[in-house]
């Protein structure tokens, strides 16, 4: 049996799924693992990868998660957070189908809206604001300048001449 070296990111031949010995191959496997398991920490993810013969450092894993756009979300009940990767797997604005995905996320995560001046304020369950703000940014809505997210609150800046209240109404319509 041939064994590849762990520092090259390979997997034992005949053990588990075939893994490319590249960053892209490792990241692809990370996406699959996050989809299949409720991963609560980077060390848990590293253990899952190690079980498949993919050794990685915490710094590399952190960089991979960042490049994949992975975020840690908590359920509405405030339970332990789990890592999720955006469906499109891409941190790029204006992804095809962005508004379809945004509508689904708004339906799942939008708790309430408010407005002031040219800003719409969106409330989400704890831990979900960054994820929803990222989806808003990726959707590249023409009437949104940008977003700022905290833990459970998003400030969405309306493009003039739209007001914050009008923007909040448009976002609610998407939900």
Curated annotation (Swiss-Prot):
Localization terms from the record: Cytoplasm
Similarity section: Belongs to the ArgR family.
Q: Which residues form a coiled coil?
A: none
Q: In which pathway does it act?
A: Amino-acid biosynthesis; L-arginine biosynthesis [regulation]
Function text: Regulates arginine biosynthesis genes.
Protein name as annotated: Arginine repressor
- Chain's gene name: argR
Q: What GO molecular function annotations does the UniProt record carry, in alphabetical order?
A: arginine binding; DNA binding; DNA-binding transcription factor activity
Which GO terms are recorded in the biological process aspect for this UniProt protein?
Answer: L-arginine biosynthetic process; protein complex oligomerization; regulation of arginine biosynthetic process
Q: How is this protein annotated for GO cellular component? A: cytoplasm
Q: One Pfam family name from the record?
A: Arg_repressor_C
Q: Does the keyword section mention rRNA-binding?
A: no
Q: Where is this region: Disordered?
A: 1-23
Which keywords describe this protein according to UniProt?
Amino-acid biosynthesis, Arginine biosynthesis, Cytoplasm, DNA-binding, Repressor, Transcription, Transcription regulation
